[in-house]
Regions:
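Cysteine-cluster motifs in flexible loop/terminal segments that predominantly coordinate metals
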Residues: 1
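Carbohydrate-binding surfaces of carbohydrate-active enzymes
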Residues: 4-494
């Protein structure tokens, strides 16, 4: 082939050729005797934007064991991408306390109840993985635990078939655009967590998908713009769409300039990391009126024809061997740097920090509230769902067109971190890691929900209980209260 193995690009090219050869030959072999044989090639994650491999799969299986390294946010983000593809998909969790190969390990039944409920809430079919021991006998305890979860699935299935996700926001995947596909892309995962914890209705997109149906399009942190993407974004804006750009997103793919008019000048990357942000009052967390630390370097912008959304404050110096300060970094100087932390101009809102990567890495509630307030500024009264749910709860809104109804899913399963690495184990044992588990499923009470739905609603039912609940319509919004629920509640609106 004339490829030099010492050149990384050549090695990657050969790897792609070998993988394509594998897909082609193994798929053909599986279908020698049956052309409609279901085939799925598992890789631990569905790579966003890799549409070239979809032709080798009859369906998609979203391997995502929360205790096996994927965590509880991987599956929702993955499901919100594959739901936009023309393939059936199922969630794949495991019965293990940790991960594959853990014979004698049992996940708490409540965890499997929650995980299967989440699969239904995100439009997926359900799969729970096990491994068969050498004697070939199924483990009774395992299947009692699985049976408990599947009994609930069976009771809910009729409200979960042939659904489509309702979304205000399209999250353009950084992994899809940049071609970098780690299991947890920091920008994508950070943005996904913000949207999940803020209870926004959203889809995850690649650059080939239709942007026009979304009220807001988010480009998280590191999406530089090609000519083809620029044309698509310009059309989206011309049709009334709104953009949230952060960090490097919006810059030209080959030059350090913004391809769209964000209402500010770009003066490059700030030399200070961390630095500080004092958002404008409309974006500030309710409990913060001082500059907040942001660990990743921001872009240096100065507002021109846009409206400033806050100010950047610099530290006294970057902490180093030459300049030392305490345990982490120096405080903010008392006066602003002269650079803006964000700007809004027309239908484009830009934040100078890679805020989603920052949230992925540090998870500060103040940072989340800053970003949520920015998204709400764009959505304004067009937001489809408001609620008083805590950030750890999850919600989706599905439509069942054939049944002419909507299904609101509410999920609540608080996680606890357990375990951790130790060194004094026998060499025959795999080293443990910290894992997230669900054990208790406490109830949430007096959950208020306000929905903006385009169709008239005449009835609201709690399912599968079959209990009707009251609601009111005010300012073209359906408002209702769920007295109490645990784990998963469906509210069917027809």
């Amino acid at each position: 082939m004339g490829l030099d193995p010492q050149v990384k690009e050549n090695r990657l090219k050969l790897a792609g050729i070998v993988l394509e050869n594998y897909y082609r030959k193994t798929t053909a072999a599986a279908r020698i005797n049956r052309l409609d044989m279901p085939v799925f090639h598992n890789s631990g994650d569905i790579p966003r934007g890799r549409r070239d491999v979809l032709q080798y799969n009859s369906h998609l299986e979203l391997e995502s064991l929360p205790t096996g390294g994927w965590g509880y946010d991987h599956f929702p983000i993955s499901a919100k991408y594959v739901s936009q593809l023309d393939l059936d998909y199922l969630g794949m969790t495991g019965k293990f306390h940790t991960t594959w190969g853990e014979f004698g390990g049992y996940k708490h039944p409540n965890a499997l109840r929650y995980e299967c409920s989440a699969m239904l809430a995100y439009g997926a079919r359900c799969s729970i993985g096990d491994q068969l021991p050498p004697l070939g006998r199924l483990d009774e305890s395992t299947y009692q635990i699985i049976g408990t979860a599947y009994a609930e699935v069976e009771a809910k299935e009729s409200w979960c078939r042939n659904v489509r996700n309702i979304a205000d926001i399209g999250l353009l995947s950084s992994a899809a655009v940049t071609g970098r596909h780690p299991q947890h892309n920091e920008a994508d995962t950070g943005a996904g967590r913000i949207l999940l914890e803020g209870h926004f209705l959203f889809d995850v997109l690649d650059a080939e998908m239709d942007f026009s149906k979304y009220k807001v399009l988010i480009l998280p942190d590191e999406i530089r713009i090609s000519e083809s993407l620029k044309s698509k974004l310009q059309q989206y804006l011309a049709d009334g769409g709104k953009l949230l750009l952060t960090g490097e997103s919006g810059l030209d793919i080959s030059q350090d300039r913004f391809v769209l008019d964000i209402g500010a000048d770009n003066l490059g990357e700030d030399e200070f990391a961390p630095n500080y942000v004092l958002p404008s009052e409309s974006l500030r967390p309710a409990y913060v009126n001082s500059p907040m630390v942001m660990y990743y370097a921001s872009r240096k912008i100065k507002t021109t024809n846009g409206r400033s959304l806050g100010e950047i404050y610099h530290p006294y110096f970057n902490r180093s061997f030459a300049h030392y300060c305490s345990h982490q970094h120096t405080p903010a100087k008392p006066t602003p740097s002269g650079f803006d932390s964000g700007v809004i101009h027309g239908n484009i809102l830009y934040l100078a920090h890679p805020v989603f990567m920052n949230y992925f890495a540090y998870g500060a509630a103040a940072c989340r509230e800053y970003i949520v307030n920015a998204i709400n500024l764009l959505l304004s009264h067009d937001i489809s769902l408001r609620s008083n749910l805590p950030s750890i709860a999850r919600t989706t809104l599905m439509q069942q067109p054939r049944e002419n109804r909507y299904i609101l899913h509410l999920l609540y399963g608080p996680t606890v971190t357990v375990g951790g690495p130790v060194d004094n184990l026998p060499k025959t044992i795999r080293k443990p890691k910290e894992i997230q588990i669900i054990e208790s499923l406490p109830a949430l009470s007096n959950v208020t929900v306000s929905l903006k739905i385009s169709h008239p609603i005449r009835r609201a039912m709690l399912e599968p209980q079959g209990r009707e609940i009251p609601f009111v319509v005010r300012d073209n919004r359906v408002e209702l209260t769920i007295d109490t629920f645990s784990c998963h509640q469906m509210v069917v609106l027809s």
